[in-house]
Amino acid sequence: MPNSEPASLLELFNSIATQGELVRSLKAGNASKDEIDSAVKMLVSLKMSYKAAAGEDYKADCPPGNPAPTSNHGPDATEAEEDFVDPWTVQTSSAKGIDYDKLIVRFGSSKIDKELINRIERATGQRPHHFLRRGIFFSHRDMNQVLDAYENKKPFYLYTGRGPSSEAMHVGHLIPFIFTKWLQDVFNVPLVIQMTDDEKYLWKDLTLDQAYSYAVENAKDIIACGFDINKTFIFSDLDYMGMSSGFYKNVVKIQKHVTFNQVKGIFGFTDSDCIGKISFPAIQAAPSFSNSFPQIFRDRTDIQCLIPCAIDQDPYFRMTRDVAPRIGYPKPALLHSTFFPALQGAQTKMSASDPNSSIFLTDTAKQIKTKVNKHAFSGGRDTIEEHRQFGGNCDVDVSFMYLTFFLEDDDKLEQIRKDYTSGAMLTGELKKALIEVLQPLIAEHQARRKEVTDEIVKEFMTPRKLSFDFQ
């Protein structure tokens, strides 16, 4: 029986498959960010066209005319048509940004609800961080299990990281570290911070020496966030792998229990990717297990790990959670943050490789003012008259989005939202409010960073016992 679907729909289906393969090959071939972004935008556009024509989402295993397979919302679920999210690329067609409720369903995580936030407040005796109150950290895996342990006086530790791809970090990179510092303070727990200089050497056009030097420079910015030197260990993969047999043994255990087929499915690796990329996920997984750090935890294997990170890193830890029980370790818990949008809009996250999309921690007050005024996408109207009459749209306005991250005063933020939405506040006034928040925040960070000496960095990065006793 001939296929009743129009040929154009099948052609569109095949075009999506071809474009998806192009995106994967560009990533594998270390293409430029612009090339990758352009290919991803085309992929998103094709998927939207397919949905409009077919009346349903594109599914790779379901050509037009075939019944859709049972929906799978687990780790291998098909990408939602509007949003493309993996550890290297974040792209959406919506001016409002990624649909995080859909992402929770697709990734199989749990929403951070009011009940969980209240429980964190009861457990710590501290008001929840505004990142929690405002839904910036919005999703979790097993956070209730961590709180069970904490309430029963059982230890846990924090693990987060940074991929040092450039000497200068941007303000978006601060988000997990600001929140992790708060977690360390309120729970009084050890913290390990992985600098994946090996990853950046494998993925970027860098020498080993460059990747390591970026790790050290980025460590200074991380230390400037205020972490306690007696409770924090920062390590470079290039350094620590050779120092710690416990760490390397866990890497090998993970490598043995994860197949090439699995990592291809999770990360989209192709046959042209170097073997270093294929084995790297095991290195990012290893800090999730306490005996990777015998100097801190001795040989204990039962201490649970809590990982605050942006949700694009979740594929690494879905793999980690899958392998953990098979090698005798507890699954790490996770707290996921939203993405920090680029100045040009929430369709993609801020990137250090695009100076006009980013506000760097090295920027001067003048540069910050210029970037916000010139590049920050506005939710305002075309004319002052229209804006006064109809008001602005905070859902797409980047300046307002940034204020939700960095303006701690809830009442002030709500007043700005009301004034901008009603038209009482103009776009220029909203941008001015953001500039007045960002300029001192970055200046204070720069002052703290100047106080971070090479000796302080060395102490943070030296494997050692922290101020906790693990028997």
Curated annotation (Swiss-Prot):
One of its GO terms (molecular function) is protein kinase binding. It comes from the Eukaryota. Induction: By IFNG/IFN-gamma. The modification Phosphoserine is found at S351. Proteolytic cleavage generates 2 forms; T1-TrpRS and T2-TrpRS. It catalyses: tRNA(Trp) + L-tryptophan + ATP = L-tryptophyl-tRNA(Trp) + AMP + diphosphate + H(+). A motif ('KMSKS' region) lies at residues 349-353. Changing D419N: In NEDMSBA; uncertain significance; when tested in a wars1-knockout zebrafish disease model is able to rescue head and eye sizes partially while the hearing phenotype was rescued completely. Residues 8-64 form the WHEP-TRS domain. Its main location: cytoplasm. A motif ('HIGH' region) lies at residues 164-173. Changing H257R: In HMND9; uncertain significance; decreased tryptophan-tRNA ligase activity; dominant negative effect; decreased general protein synthesis; decreased cell viability; no effect on homodimerization. Signal peptide: none annotated. It is an enzyme of class 6 (ligase). One of its GO terms (cellular component) is cytosol. It is found in: Cytoplasm. Its EC number is 6.1.1.2. CDD domains: TrpRS_core, WEPRS_RNA. InterPro entries: aa-tRNA-synth_I_CS (IPR001412), aa-tRNA-synth_Ic (IPR002305), Rossmann-like_a/b/a_fold (IPR014729), Trp-tRNA-ligase (IPR002306), uS15_NS1_RNA-bd_sf (IPR009068), WHEP-TRS_dom (IPR000738). GO terms for biological process: angiogenesis; negative regulation of cell population proliferation; negative regulation of protein kinase activity; positive regulation of gene expression; positive regulation of protein-containing complex assembly; regulation of angiogenesis; translation; tryptophanyl-tRNA aminoacylation. NCBIfam families: trpS (TIGR00233). Homodimer. Interacts with an oxidized form of GAPDH. GAPDH stimulates the aminoacylation activity of isoform 2. It is linked to Neuronopathy, distal hereditary motor, autosomal dominant 9: A form of distal hereditary motor neuronopathy, a heterogeneous group of neuromuscular disorders caused by selective degeneration of motor neurons in the anterior horn of the spinal cord, without sensory deficit in the posterior horn. The overall clinical picture consists of a classical distal muscular atrophy syndrome in the legs without clinical sensory loss. The disease starts with weakness and wasting of distal muscles of the anterior tibial and peroneal compartments of the legs. This is Tryptophan--tRNA ligase, cytoplasmic.
